[in-house]
Structure formats: structure tokens, C-alpha cells
Design a protein with these regions (language model features):
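Surface-exposed cleft-lining segments at the edges of enzyme active sites
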Residues: 121-134, 162-173
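Non-cysteine beta-strand/loop elements that form the S-adenosyl-L-methionine
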Residues: 33-40, 105-115, 153-160, 196
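Short, surface-exposed amphipathic charged segments that create phosphate/polyanion-binding patches used
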Residues: 98-99, 122-124, 271-273
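An N-terminally biased module of ancient metal coordination in phosphate/nucleic-acid-related enzymes
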Residues: 1-86, 90, 94, 99-102, ...
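Histidine/acidic residue-rich metal-binding segments in metalloenzymes
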Residues: 24, 59-73, 79-81, 98-104, ...
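Charged catalytic cores and adjacent phosphate/nucleic-acid-binding surfaces used
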Residues: 1-10, 20, 31, 116, ...
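Active-site rim beta-loop-alpha module in soluble metabolic enzymes
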Residues: 157-166, 192
Length: 273
């Protein structure tokens, strides 16, 4: 059993209306022993059809104050950790370095939500190119980000772009992008970074988490050991989403343990059948 959901969003994220209480109560009801709140902090996020420019920023002092209160309130039934999901862009390396040194996060997820200033969530990103071209560009941009930014603990939802392609996984396999993906995985391993298994891919109809199990398996083959797990829930009903399947996938990739982060340090938990 996996007993920690290390990726979830609350009202502090522009794209979630969920109260922190609702997410924590859902975690307790799902049998979680720990959670990490990881609200979106995407500096320099552009205007989109749904959000104004700069929408994915929030008051970190208020965030820490509120979550610290809830750590105490829930301490007898759930360990509450304070994290953040930062949106990687190559020019933000120094900004995120200063931010993560200033605030005592337990866990920092680094995620690529923008590809040369465009969010693949919107169809405009795919106009004039094939899914294959778009996916390859996303991996190349991820490599560029990793070379510029070191202030995170685990890479969030690698292959996220596949969720939004016109044909989703039809144009995607590890083998097709092995050169780019291997460069990403080798960088993570050599820099002591984790790889997130993000279960949101299951609810987006992909039939697999992000990244694909073949990528997780390759991470292990290359010597990777730090796999974090999160549902990427923005609503309480998605907390610990499809976690039984998560256990089966991770063990099928050769892992007998997963990682949680406390104080920016990995803690390894054995996967209990």
C-alpha cells in the first residue's frame, strides 16, 4: 500500500477551488498517513483563455501560516507537509533558488507547464505541427530547463504533454523519444533528483500515469531510486486517485519502495502489498 499523496492543489492554486480541509479529510478517508500540499507557483505564466497573466502566484506567508495551523490540527490523524509545485522556465533559475532558500518547504516539485511560452493544455500549442513534433519539443524544453534550474526535488509529470495531443498516446512511446528521455533521466539521477509518478494521467484517459511505466522502468535501469507519487488532485474526490493501480505499476517497474520528502530530504517507504 502507498500511504502518501505528495501532489495536491487547494484554493491557493488558481485552478482549484478546494479547501485545504476538504483535501485533508479526503486523505484521511482514503487511508493516507501523510500528504504534501503542493500548490502551483508558476512565475511569469502568460495570459490564457482561462486565466490572466500571473495568475499562478500566491502569498507564501499566508500559505505557510495556514498550513502550519493545519499541521497541528491534523497531527493525530495525518501528517501534513508543506510543499510547492514550481513551473520551470529557463530564465527563472535564480528566482526559484532564492525562493526555495527563503521558505522551509518539505518538498518542491519542478514541472514543465510551458513550452516556449505556450501551455499544451490549449490546442494552439499543437497548431501547425504533429503530435510527434510537439512531444519532442516538450522533451527538448525539459532538458533546457533542467540545465538551468536545480531548486527542486522531483520532476513532475514528465510526458505531461501527451495528455493533450490530438491522438494522445498514439504518437508516443519511450522508444520513439529514447534519446531525449534518457538525457532527462540521466540528469535527474546524476543530480540526485526524483521522478514523480503522477496518477492524473489515469483520469485523463491515457491508461497510464505520467510518465509512462516504460519511462519509470528505464529510470530504474539507469540507476534511479527516488520515485515520488502523487494524484495531482485539484478536487477532494481525486486525492490518492487510483492508488491501488499505482502500487501495481511501481512494483511492476521493479521498485519495492517509493520516496516521500520531509525537509527536502527523501524518506523511503517500502511498498506493502
Amino acid at each position: 500500500m502507498i500511504t502518501c499523496d505528495a501532489h495536491m492543489h487547494t484554493r491557493f492554486s488558481e485552478d482549484s477551488d478546494a479547501s485545504v480541509h476538504s483535501m485533508l479529510d479526503a486523505a484521511v478517508n482514503k487511508g493516507m498517513q501523510a500528504v504534501c500540499i503542493t500548490d502551483h507557483l508558476d512565475k511569469d505564466f502568460p495570459e490564457t483563455p482561462d486565466f490572466p497573466a500571473g495568475a499562478f502566484m500566491f502569498d507564501l506567508d499566508e500559505y505557510f501560516s495556514r498550513l502550519t495551523q493545519l499541521k497541528t490540527e491534523y497531527q493525530k490523524k495525518l501528517e501534513v507537509r508543506i510543499g510547492v509545485e514550481i513551473g520551470l522556465q529557463p530564465h527563472l533559475g535564480e528566482y526559484y533558488k532564492e525562493l526555495t532558500e527563503k521558505y522551509p518547504f518539505d518538498f518542491v516539485i519542478g514541472s514543465v507547464h510551458l513550452i516556449h511560452g505556450q501551455d499544451p493544455y490549449y490546442r494552439g500549442f499543437f497548431e501547425g505541427r504533429s503530435d510527434e513534433e510537439a512531444y519532442r519539443e516538450a522533451f527538448q524544453v525539459t532538458i533546457e530547463n533542467l540545465k538551468k534550474i536545480d531548486s527542486f526535488d522531483s520532476l513532475g509529470h514528465l510526458d505531461y504533454v501527451v495528455r493533450y495531443g490530438a491522438h494522445q498516446a498514439e504518437a508516443y512511446s519511450y522508444r520513439k523519444y529514447a534519446e531525449e528521455i534518457d538525457e532527462i533521466l540521466k540528469h535527474l539521477i546524476s543530480h540526485g533528483k526524483g521522478l514523480e509518478m503522477n496518477m492524473a494521467g489515469m483520469k485523463y484517459g491515457l491508461g497510464f500515469p505520467n510518465p509512462h511505466p516504460d519511462v519509470i522502468r528505464r529510470y530504474k535501469e539507469l540507476g534511479g531510486e527516488i520515485v515520488t507519487i502523487g494524484a495531482d488532485a485539484h478536487r477532494s474526490e481525486h486525492v490518492a486517485f487510483d492508488y491501488e493501480q499505482a502500487r501495481e505499476i511501481l512494483t511492476g517497474c521493479g521498485f519495492s519502495y517509493y520516496a516521500e520528502f520531509k525537509g527536502r530530504k527523501p524518506v523511503f517507504r517500502r511498498i506493502v502489498p
